[in-house]
């Protein structure tokens, strides 16, 4: 996504990191003879009271291999928009997108770092070329760079949608199309892929049903009707815009009982083939991962699965 100056790294693999004030989620994926091997996946505690150098100190102590490094932006630090591509040369694309996005941001466009990535062309002729534009807060990108200053092979700041796309593309049924859904208490995200191709992403504004309606049983924790509506809108757009056969394989990102309840509800309401993602089955893991670690490190794993270096 947001590429930094290229720094040399050896081996075919990548380190993925998500950064919080009190912890780092770490994943290392190596690619050996076409297989992705998750060699390390853990949460590293950070003493937030130790000051701005605490994260770098934790990374130094972790004794990481010399591999390219990706960090992942948090949801509050960027805006993702599907827009018609400006008719300009590639070298001018980011500048053109900056002004196209300025009215859609809740921060000054001058304070944004812009990048773009393509989606397949629409199925019907006469429609303009579409692409995703990402506007990240410059301060967030700079924070990532500062936290990873001790890692000379840090080269990419990624976004959650592309990390989830990497995971969805690894699902065995992805050749026929896969939807990967990740939810929390107040927000969610769905990505649609077919084979290795990223087609669509949608962010969801969710609410906890127990707050909205006083529902407290296990199957009523989330606003499932709203999730189903947003999911159906995404699938309808995918079929209509790209003239693709329907996706009926839905994978729920690990999130403890929340994911299990959601999978149960959506399987009943849609008739889709629905399951909760298990990284132990998706990848070759050198150490089995408990569900809590999978949930905490999911985006770091997706970032570590990235193989391309730059987007444009």
Located regions from the model:
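Hydrophobic/aromatic-enriched cytosolic interaction surfaces used to assemble or bind macromolecules
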Residues: 1-312
């Amino acid at each position: 996504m947001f590429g930094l100056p290229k720094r040399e790294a050896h081996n075919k693999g990548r380190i993925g990191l998500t950064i919080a004030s009190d912890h780092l989620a770490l994943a290392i994926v190596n690619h050996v003879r076409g297989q992705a091997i998750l060699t390390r996946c853990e949460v590293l505690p950070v003493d937030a009271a130790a000051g701005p150098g605490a994260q770098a100190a934790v990374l130094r102590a972790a004794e990481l291999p010399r591999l390219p490094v990706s960090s992942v932006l948090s949801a509050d630090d960027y805006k993702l928009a599907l827009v018609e591509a400006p008719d300009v040369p590639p070298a001018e694309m980011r500048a053109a997108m900056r002004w196209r996005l300025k009215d859609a941001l809740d921060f000054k466009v001058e304070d944004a770092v812009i990048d773009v990535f393509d989606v397949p062309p629409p199925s019907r002729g006469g429609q303009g070329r579409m692409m995703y534009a990402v506007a990240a807060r410059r301060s967030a990108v700079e924070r990532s760079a500062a936290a990873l200053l001790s890692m000379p092979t840090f080269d990419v700041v990624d976004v959650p949608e592309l990390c989830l796309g990497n995971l969805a593309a690894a699902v065995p049924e992805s050749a026929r199309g896969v939807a990967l859904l990740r939810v929390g208490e107040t927000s969610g995200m769905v990505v649609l892929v077919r084979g290795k191709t990223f087609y669509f992403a949608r962010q969801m504004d969710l609410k906890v049903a127990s707050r909205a309606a006083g529902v407290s049983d296990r199957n009523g924790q989330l606003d499932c009707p709203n999730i189903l509506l947003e999911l159906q809108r995404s699938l309808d757009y995918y079929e209509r815009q790209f003239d693709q056969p329907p996706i009926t394989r839905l994978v729920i990102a690990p999130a403890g009982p929340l994911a299990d309840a959601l999978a149960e509800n959506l399987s009943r309401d849609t008739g889709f083939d629905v399951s909760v993602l298990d990284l132990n089955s998706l990848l070759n893991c050198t150490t089995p991962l408990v569900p809590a670690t999978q949930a905490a490190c999911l985006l770091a794993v997706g970032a570590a699965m990235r193989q391309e270096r730059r987007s444009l």
